[in-house]
A protein has these predicted regions:
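Metal-dependent phosphoesterase core characteristic of DEDDh/y 3'-5' exonuclease domains
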Residues: 1, 16-127, 132-135
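Conserved non-catalytic scaffold segment of RNase H-like nuclease domains
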Residues: 1-41, 45, 87, 91-97, ...
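Generic secondary-structure transition motif, activating predominantly at the C-termini of alpha-helices
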Residues: 16, 69-72, 98, 136-140, ...
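Sequence-level motif detector for i,i+2 pairs with an aromatic at +2
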Residues: 56, 180-183, 228
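A broadly tuned preference for mixed-charge, low-complexity surface segments
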Residues: 73-92, 154-180, 235-249
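Acidic catalytic cores of enzymes that act on phosphate-bearing nucleotides/polynucleotides
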Residues: 134-214, 222
Length: 293
């Protein structure tokens, strides 16, 4: 027999709000944490305070595993999917590394598997583990961002796709005009032509056109990085030459593109305009779904 949602929300809230608690999961930032926020909202608890108040924080092991594969893969077995690309499914990683994980997707089994994978990274790549853990909050991450110089950083994100290890060098072009937690980044491995040749309206259309519909047109090489969502960012030299080669990333091309951006500062104003005039947010009329209204 389970609890009703109000009781369940109170029990979870009591656990999550213990001071100096770090909530860790596997893809939790994009899924579990959104569920948590909405449950707390529906039951009259602050939907955000649990993740920052009283020195609390959150962290996501999925991007830790992606970063470990891309930047420091030694000591861990990396399984592949049917397409020959690295798989970061928790049940694949545990099997490849000899970790017991019966009943995958059973809540408790996944908790123990997540803890075991975290211990594995901590043991095999302790410096990377400690770096990522210490850079899980937006204040620490903000110290890496140098917008005026567009200083390149290495960024690991599922948005880049497994074919290049979810990794690229990026340059911070500008802060988002409305969201102070978001940085507009340029994917330096991409084609700079859309940024240089298109006006703001055409660039916005290119940005929001699905890749499958672009045909031979190059995608707009820009993405938002939300510093309050535990993104993986590090100094550019964290990406070793041998790992760049393994991932198919040309460091030389990335650095040349960074120079090209610095030589064309008008791109910054154009890209800010793209995000300043994005499609308006449509509020929900469902009272239980108005968290982000």
């Amino acid at each position: 027999k389970g609890d009703n949602e109000a009781t369940f929300a109170r029990r979870i809230h009591d656990l999550f709000t213990v001071p100096q608690t770090c909530i860790v999961g596997y893809n939790n930032v994009r899924f579990d944490d959104e569920v948590t926020r909405n449950i707390f909202y529906r039951n009259f608890y602050d939907p955000y305070a649990w993740s920052w108040q009283h020195d609390n924080s959150r962290w996501d092991l999925l991007d830790v595993m992606r970063a470990c594969y891309a930047l420091r893969p030694e000591g861990i077995a990396w399984p592949e999917n049917d397409e020959g690309l690295p798989s970061f499914r928790l049940e694949h990683l545990t099997v490849a590394n000899g970790i017991e994980h019966q009943n995958a997707h059973d809540a408790m089994a996944d908790v123990y598997a997540t803890i075991a994978m975290a211990k594995l990274v901590k043991t095999r790549q302790p410096r990377l583990f400690d770096y990522l853990y210490s850079h899980r909050n937006k204040r620490k991450l903000a110290t890496l961002i140098d917008v005026p110089q567009m200083k390149p950083l290495v960024h690991v994100s599922g948005m880049f796709g497994a074919a290049r290890g979810n990794t690229s060098l990026v340059a911070p072009l500008a802060w988002h005009p409305e969201n102070r937690n978001a940085v507009i980044m340029v994917d330096l491995a991409g084609d700079m032509a859309p940024l240089l040749e298109l006006d703001a309206d055409a660039l916005r259309e290119r940005l929001y056109t699905p890749r499958a519909e672009l045909g031979d047109l190059p995608a707009a090489p820009i993405k938002l990085v939300h510093l309050n969502k535990c993104p993986v960012l590090a100094q550019a030299n964290t990406l070793r030459p041998q790992d760049a080669d393994r991932l198919g990333i040309s460091i030389q091309r990335c650095l040349e593109n960074a120079q090209l951006l610095r030589a064309n500062p008008q791109v910054r104003e154009k890209v800010v305009a793209v995000y300043a005039e994005a499609e308006p947010f449509v509020p929900s009329e469902n009272v239980d779904a108005q968290l982000y209204n």
